[in-house]
Amino acid sequence: MSWKIPDIELANISKYRGELMGAAMLFIILFHVGLPREDLFFGLRRIGNVGVDIFLFLSGVGLWFSWTKRPDLQHFFANRYWRVYPAWLIMASAFYIPDYINGGGHSTSLVDLAGDILINWDFWLHDELTFWYIPATMMLYLFAPAYMQLIIRHPVYRWLPVIMLMWCILTQYVTPIHHAVGHLEIFWSRVPIFFIGINCGEMVRRKQTMDGASIWMIIVMFLMSLLSSIFLEQVKHGEFPLFLERMLYIPLTVSSILLLNRLFRRLPSWLNKAISFVGGVSLEAYLIHSQFVLKYIERWNLSYWPTFFICVVITLPLAWLLHEGVTRAVDKIRR
């Protein structure tokens, strides 16, 4: 009697999107909680920022669904920016205005303050990382429709992420390019996974499957990328360009998503719903947790895990309130 491993259903990427987003958000909070360099958990904690890559991959898949359903630019941009920008404006104002008044140094003039609130321009100009993921995502949205139309008409251009990977190398090692835009390494090194997500969108939409035997390849990919990333952070932290590790994050992201889907299939429904709830308010949680919750909790000098759990417990209700308030206000405006 032969035992066959069930095929891997790519549709689960869509089915468990909420849970995946929730897990990614928890990874990011784990990454932001401080930990001494000599701690044995330091390397694993440092790669929690792979949650950003998971966000971007899932965002790419979701954009493909949206575009193929209704390829209309006005509808596309309205849905995307009405979802992100109001929450961004509220939390950016809540951070940058008091910071400017109190001389915190993030905004040096009223013009600089306006730029930080509207488009977070100090990220683009000086690599100011307070809320970098949100302006980076909004920038990627600008280019997504053109890319999706391009690969629909000319599928060969699905290979463009390879060129994006080459660009990451150029921005690090070609001196004129590095001087011009090298400060945006954290953005450039995340661009490929976003467009890879778009590339995978059609396979997810068509509910394609992978041979069950491929699970062994996925596990090898996961372990190689995970363990090498942990080693780099635990042993070589600060001794290598970060884009190199983020190249490892690409296979780590894809393999993690596929393995997490198998986990979510087996978890009790209440736990899936709880993790999915975190995913549903992940935008707001990202904006709130670090600057408005975590930095105050860390003053209590608690150990790592109590700090993490207290941060989560405080952040989630605040994120839900922001999400509900913004959603209701936007619904009224758009009627």
Residue ranges and their predicted role:
Residues 1-169, 209-220, 269-272, 277-284, ...:
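Membrane-cytosol interface segments of multi-pass membrane proteins
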Residues 35-37, 99, 172, 202, ...:
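Active-site environment of divalent metal-dependent phosphoester hydrolases
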Residues 142-146, 195-203, 259, 321-324:
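Amphipathic alpha-helical segments that form well-ordered structural scaffolds
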Residues 157-203:
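Loop-centered beta-sheet repeat module
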Residues 182-195, 202-284, 290-311:
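Alpha-helical transmembrane segments and terminal signal-anchor/GPI-anchor hydrophobic tails
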